[in-house]
Amino acid sequence: MKAKKRIFFTGGGTGGHVFPGIAIISKLRELDTNIEFFWLGQKDSMEDKIIKEHAYIKFIAIPSGKLRRYFSLQNFTDFFKVIFGIIKSFFIIKKYKPQIIYATGGFVSSPPIIAASLLKVKSITHEMDLDPGLATKINSKFANKIHISFKESTKYFKNKNVLYTGSPIRKEFSNPNPNIIKNLTQDTKKPIISILGGSLGAEILNKLTLNIKNKIDAYFIHQCGRNLDATRENNYLRSQFFNAEEMASIIKFSNIIISRAGSGAIKEFANAGACVIFIPFVKGSRGDQIRNAKLLEEQNACFKIDEENLSESKIINIIKEILENKEKSNILRNNIKEFHNQDSSNLIANLLLKEFGKINAG
């Protein structure tokens, strides 16, 4: 009887740090039925909620503090949370003996990567954004390999074992069902404008939607997060969340997407060849979304409006320009596809299987 392969994934805080890991796990399950999957994350967190929807992944809670570049009294207590997270990860790894640990980003991913280094367990960290966050900068000092989602990120990891893999997307996005968006929009013949606030929702996008939805002749799909109730009105559908199949259909078949500029969302839009207006998140952010969107804007792959320049009239004018200029829309759709031009889930899954082979051979 073959010994079970075992892999730990770790990452969280937002869906963008969780869904890529799930995409890799789904592909690994297709390729090899002899693998056990674990996820290390914080209790009652975004990753806890998402992972518990997947019975084949065992979730293990670990403590971890937020890593900050600025002074805060919380830095003192969070430092000890990180230490406790490393200690707990150390003993969890010793107990379950995974052959590989794969980090998908977020502060919670650093303690397991550091513990893996102490125990000489193979580890890989994946930077989803254009430039590395503090967690990835820390992880890169301890991990054996670094995977990146943007080719342009290589310059941030000099003298490191870096591989451009792209960002994995969930399998539901590979073949979206057009009937889903027809049902969501009651088979409207109007242009479809989808405003997506991400896994945490976005207050500024919620306000924007309510202000413009009756000023443009279109059907609006609005993903609002927990701060608003779901509703359906004439030419307007609002939901706190959409499942993966619904989101895949929305992204593929909407005429326009208005969204934040998280790396996971960008890759899903690129895979679909979506026409996107990005409004990057600023408050509480390290500026990664601004740089993500700026890169695409420079390649004529999107429209970008910074929050400080956002106005009702500006967004309405851009929407009208896209709807009235099909050539411009097609240029944006073709150019954004260049940011997701490989099957990243399959690539990474096969790389991990090779790592398992090397470990077992050794």
UniProtKB/Swiss-Prot annotation:
It is an enzyme of class 2 (transferase). Pathway: Cell wall biogenesis; peptidoglycan biosynthesis. It is a peripheral membrane protein. Coiled coil: none annotated. GO terms for molecular function: UDP-N-acetyl-D-glucosamine:N-acetylmuramoyl-L-alanyl-D-glutamyl-meso-2,6-diaminopimelyl-D-alanyl-D-alanine-diphosphoundecaprenol 4-beta-N-acetylglucosaminlytransferase activity; undecaprenyldiphospho-muramoylpentapeptide beta-N-acetylglucosaminyltransferase activity. UDP-N-acetyl-alpha-D-glucosamine binds at T14, G15, G16, R170, S199, Q289. Its EC number is 2.4.1.227. It comes from the Bacteria. One of its GO terms (biological process) is peptidoglycan biosynthetic process. InterPro entries: GlcNAc_MurG, Glyco_trans_28_C, GlycoTrans_28_N. Belongs to the glycosyltransferase 28 family. MurG subfamily. This is UDP-N-acetylglucosamine--N-acetylmuramyl-(pentapeptide) pyrophosphoryl-undecaprenol N-acetylglucosamine transferase. The lineage of its organism: Bacteria, Pseudomonadati, Spirochaetota, Spirochaetia, Spirochaetales. The gene is murG.
